[in-house]
């Protein structure tokens, strides 16, 4: 059984992942990390990652860039691989992700959906053809007014592809 720490457990994606894992007999969320324990999870929730002394095989992160530095330090110190899905990371944080990945496995993705990852591949292929034909490429995105990171991690990933 894969034991998971859900970092950002009370957010939308944290709850989606919690629901999926709950139905999987081969995985279990053994702890959650979030700024508050809202009492809606079947596992213990810690408001300080350093207080989490639970044994785990992996950390899945859907929190925010504000929590990334401490998460990376924790992951490296405890040698727990991390799936990093937070967006809006600074250049310094991206460098820290790179450095941490030399000590422990880090999978970083701006968007985990199959649709977006298929789109990233299609954009790579289209860019090769269109750029050589003289086309200019532009990304335009629209979000609700409460969007935390703009441009979004997905838009940045599309631009990088």
Annotate each predicted stretch with a short phrase.
Residues 23-42:
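NAD(P)-binding Rossmann-fold cofactor-contacting core
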Residues 7, 62-63, 85-86, 109, ...:
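Structural motif
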Residues 40-50:
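Active-site regions of enzymes building and remodeling cell-envelope glycoconjugates
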Residues 29, 45, 82-83, 106-108:
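Hydrophobic beta-strand scaffold residues
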Residues 72-73, 77, 86-108, 117-119, ...:
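Rossmann-fold NAD(P)-binding glycine/threonine-rich loop
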Residues 34-35, 87-89, 111-112, 142-144:
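Short, ordered loop/turn segments at secondary-structure junctions
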Residues 2-20, 46, 127-161:
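Active-site-lining helix/loop region of Rossmann-like oxidoreductase modules
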Residues 49-58, 65-84, 91-96:
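Rossmann-fold NAD(P) dinucleotide-binding segment
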């Amino acid at each position: 059984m894969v034991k998971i720490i859900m970092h950002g457990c009370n957010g939308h994606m944290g709850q989606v992942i919690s629901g999926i894992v709950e139905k999987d007999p081969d995985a279990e969320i053994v702890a959650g990390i979030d700024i508050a324990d809202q009492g809606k999870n079947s596992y213990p929730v810690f408001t300080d990652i350093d207080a989490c002394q639970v044994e785990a095989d992996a950390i899945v992160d859907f929190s925010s860039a504000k929590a990334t530095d401490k998460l990376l330090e924790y992951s490296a110190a405890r040698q727990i691989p991390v799936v990093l899905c937070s967006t809006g990371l600074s250049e310094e944080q991206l460098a820290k992700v790179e450095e941490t990945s030399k000590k422990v496995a880090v999978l970083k993705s701006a968007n985990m959906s199959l649709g977006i990852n298929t789109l990233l591949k299609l954009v790579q292929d289209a860019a090769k053809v269109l750029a050589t034909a003289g086309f200019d490429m532009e990304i335009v995105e629209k979000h609700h007014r409460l969007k935390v990171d703009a441009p979004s991690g997905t838009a940045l990933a599309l631009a990088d592809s």
